[in-house]
């Protein structure tokens, strides 16, 4: 009986039942600082009928720049695209932030497309966010120095603030994303960050990070879950791009009531396990596995002294740690690039990973049911 029920779920949420052929979409022509890729995506077959929403956000360097309000020095306009179920009733909304592949994920990633279609079919709205084009990038997978990691999380929180007053929002929100998008999901689960944007201790109701970067993102060393949140951490056990071990360890460190945070490591699955084809070698994808770990204390300062030693004493990029944080507030993108230049000199940056897998239909029911159970 149980096996039959699981089979039914797989059939119900099967991607093969929802025809989708990635369109011939020119991301270069549709992505500029003054033109979000979502403008073009909203006109494609299968994506039309939604609402373009532009909202104010900020560009920061890391969590410390947010804690000390340094991000307020760098306002930016961000574009989101909201797709809602038919009708006029109020619904929950899942906010998607994209991977290092950029907002083109929403077009070319079959799983992202089908997941959104299934959520909408179940009565849950979806908002895509373009974290890159306004910041002068289309993708970052070859060069992660282009856009600081924290900014996808800032955008997601600013989008949540805007959607709280949307006439069709019922006040319940989820968020998800893969890789860099999954990293954003981890960021917004911590009360120390979310409380800078939202009132009180509450944040997203349901958070599902996939294949996040947990060792090099600048997460709090002592994380604490927002009070209203259920979280499901999913990672491929064979992932050599973003390593599962560190996300499992970080999730286990999160201060939260029992049962609020669940971890599912999929043995044998690689990064982008729902790509719809067999794993392949991506030679140009950047990794930082040999660099010193990057976590911060509750004040947002480095917990690993190697970073200050490199920036201040060895490479003399800044006169002091405080001078670095001051520079990071004024020009976060420049400070981020400076950090990558130091890592290149230290020869701790590598390239080459295995990505892909044909696990869409196996994974889809788990993904959809997590949001149904926690938002509907």
Task: For every predicted segment, state its role.
Residues 22-89:
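N-terminal cap/lid segment of alpha/beta-hydrolase-fold proteins
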Residues 168-179:
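Alpha/beta-hydrolase fold nucleophile elbow
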Residues 199-268:
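The feature captures the conserved acid-bearing segment of alpha/beta-hydrolase catalytic domains
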């Amino acid at each position: 009986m149980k096996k039959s029920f699981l089979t039914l779920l797989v059939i119900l949420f099967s991607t093969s039942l929802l025809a989708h052929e990635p369109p011939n979409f020119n991301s270069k022509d549709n992505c500029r600082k003054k033109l979000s890729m979502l403008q073009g995506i909203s006109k494609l077959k299968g994506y039309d009928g939604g609402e373009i929403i532009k909202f104010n956000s900020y560009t920061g360097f890391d969590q410390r720049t947010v804690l000390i309000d340094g991000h307020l020095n760098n306002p930016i306009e961000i574009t989101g695209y909201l797709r809602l179920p038919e009708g006029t009733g109020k619904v929950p909304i899942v906010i998607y932030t994209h991977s290092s592949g950029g907002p083109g994920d929403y077009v070319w990633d079959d799983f992202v497309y089908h997941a959104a279609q299934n959520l909408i079919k179940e009565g849950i709205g979806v908002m895509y966010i373009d974290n890159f084009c306004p910041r002068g990038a289309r993708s970052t997978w070859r060069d992660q120095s282009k856009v600081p990691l924290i900014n996808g999380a800032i955008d997601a929180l600013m989008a949540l603030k805007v959607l709280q007053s949307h006439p069709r929002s019922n006040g319940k929100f989820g968020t998800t994303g893969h890789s860099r998008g999954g990293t954003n999901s981890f960021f917004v689960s911590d009360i120390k960050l979310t409380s800078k944007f939202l009132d009180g201790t509450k944040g997203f109701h349901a958070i599902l990070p996939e294949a996040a970067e947990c060792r090099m993102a600048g997460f709090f060393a002592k994380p604490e879950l927002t009070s209203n949140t259920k979280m499901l951490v999913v990672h491929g056990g064979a992932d050599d791009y973003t390593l599962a071990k560190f996300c499992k360890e970080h999730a286990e460190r999160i201060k939260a009531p029992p049962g609020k945070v669940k971890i599912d490591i999929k043995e044998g699955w690689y990064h982008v396990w729902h790509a719809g084809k067999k794993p392949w070698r991506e030679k140009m994808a950047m990794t930082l596995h040999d660099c010193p770990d990057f976590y911060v204390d509750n004040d947002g300062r480095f917990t690993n002294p190697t970073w200050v030693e490199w920036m201040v004493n060895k490479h003399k990029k800044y006169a002091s740690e405080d001078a670095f944080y001051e520079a990071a507030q004024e020009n976060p993108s420049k400070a981020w690039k400076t950090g990558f230049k130091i890592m290149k000199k230290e020869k701790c940056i590598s390239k080459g990973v295995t990505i892909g897998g044909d696990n869409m239909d196996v994974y889809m029911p788990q993904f959809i049911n997590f949001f149904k159970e926690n938002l509907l």
